[in-house]
Amino acid sequence: MTIRILPARLANQIAAGEVVERPASVVKELVENSLDSGATKIDIDIEKGGAKLIRIRDNGSGIVKDELGLALSRHATSKIHTLDDLEAIMSLGFRGEALASISSVSRLTLTSRPATQEQAWSAYTEGRDMQVKLQPTAHPIGTTVEVVDLFFNTPARRKFLRTEKTEFAHIDELLKRIALSCFDVSITLRHNGKVIRQYRAAHNDLQAEKRLATVCGQAFVRCMLKIELEHQGLKLHGWITTPEGARQQSDLQYCYVNGRMMRDKLINHAIRQSYETSLKPEQFAAYVLFIELDPHQVDVNVHPAKHEVRFHQARLVHDFIYQALASALAQSDSIEQPQINESAFHYQAEPEVAPQGSFPAESNEVPQAVYHAIEKAPAYPRKAGQEQQLQPVAPLESSFSSEQGREVSPAPHNERKAWMESRSPARHTTSSNQSERYGEPAPSKQQVKAYAELLHTPDFPSQNVECHPSPSIASPVQELGKAVSVVAQRYLLTTTKAGCQLISLARAEFYRTLGQLNGDKAPLKSQPLLVPLSLKLEKGLVHAAQEHQDRFARMGILFKMRNEKALMVMGVPAPLRQQNLQLLIPDLLSYAASQAQKEELAQNDTAMAQWLALRVAKVKSHYTLSEAIQIISELEQLWQEKLPLQDSQLVTSVDFSATIAQLT
């Protein structure tokens, strides 16, 4: 058989088989063109499920007369020009195949007028002939594309179209996905002359939630958690639902990469893995998630319909999504939190007797239910739509009540501001050189009221502001107490029944990490690596890994032996996921080999956990008040009644007696 170059019209029809699968495929390509043109309003008219008519009208930038015919040619586009453009695609379309493919299997009319032209022009082409006819017409600034009699010249393709109702349902679902990707664009959908959907442009959070409710339903909105995270150039934001919002089918799963609709296996696996302990096998998560990253780090030129992408750092993307969602779900209010004793943000419900000369303690008494609301406040993330509710909690500017009923001077303005910002819905940033920190609680109406009551105190004369040390100040401290202020950027001043004390935040970081790594009580949960790490080691290190394999497993570190000089790291606990495992694991095995004969290593895992904590704990040069509160709160939850209060490098009492004497 002779090899020949295919005629252009035949090549276009073959390409149409990839691009134009059904009427919904046509709508997708044309609406994406409208979005790329900068349109803020798109009207879509459908007749007979799209088989008879598809009309897309927008108010975008338009096409000049001289380029109308070229726009209907194959591989003609204004979106990329060089190979560098192909490697950093931000537009939705880029191949230049859609209009040519659609026009080869339909009767297509392209009408457009840019702002630089007074006259609009229309280009018409039909089927295999591919001859473009231009004529002047009336049209506002923007573009209209009419696709009539889809597959009229390919009866076999037309025969495989489903019923009118089914084909329109595909178009409707497609536009739901598009509506969630561009909240600032108004979209109207008509079928057989009747308005079916009307998505008004959303310019604020409230309007965005209305569109979200329109697309996903009120049940989704009631159970949703708002996610906003950023790490190493990756950004993740959107909404997920708590396990209570799980569905029996996967009909509310929307994911976007750089604004592009995706059905990517890597992303789906990360999301499923984050829900694996929360959902039953027959349940499906519901979510609307947006992933943003450097366009050079993702290849969208993989699938003809652009439904899949290839990430250059697949493991990083997978683990980032998994960690973000798993942490959010673990700390949502749908999961019972550990009982919190006296802590940096918890206030005793029982009123103390006020010393003589101060205002009565009952003036600040708060019902037990109020404290319960604060105690059970979830740690992350913020419920969407509660930004407005947080505004009344401004009395932090005034002083707040100590447990003796006396006022304590407020923290400096910059620290109060940082504390308030940490409770706002701003993006929670995780940098590569510090441990992952979770956001603050998402208060309900009851919780907001509780905070307002706790933080509000009457305006008493300044002479009542005192901080009396207890006569038994030399006795051991029994609690970390309530946070007052950060001192010298590295220490936290707190108050307890015994008086005031300073906590070393660097030392607290170490103990927090140690608490996360200590598997004496219960084995730590191992988080599998997307790509297992293969290490070539000395024979003695591999032997140490085999000898202490059970101990490493209790700490969440899973090995798979390959041979006597190589092994694979299959999983690590959460505190180690962001570490350089290629350096850390060999050092850990060297430590285990050198300490194998010591009794402390043979009896428990504490020594190994301490060794790891010293190397993993990320100590900062300065801390904000919100960061300090987060550290000691997690420290109390991890250690509970076994707080290392005997460590003088962690906490020490502060006696203000001499200072107070100078002021009296």
Swiss-Prot record:
Residues 427-436 have a biased composition (Polar residues). It holds the Pfam family MutL_C. Keywords: DNA damage, DNA repair. GO terms for molecular function: ATP binding; ATP hydrolysis activity; ATP-dependent DNA damage sensor activity; mismatched DNA binding. The keyword Magnesium does not apply. PROSITE patterns: DNA_MISMATCH_REPAIR_1. Belongs to the DNA mismatch repair MutL/HexB family. HAMAP family: DNA_mis_repair. This is DNA mismatch repair protein MutL. It comes from Vibrio vulnificus (strain CMCP6). The gene is mutL.
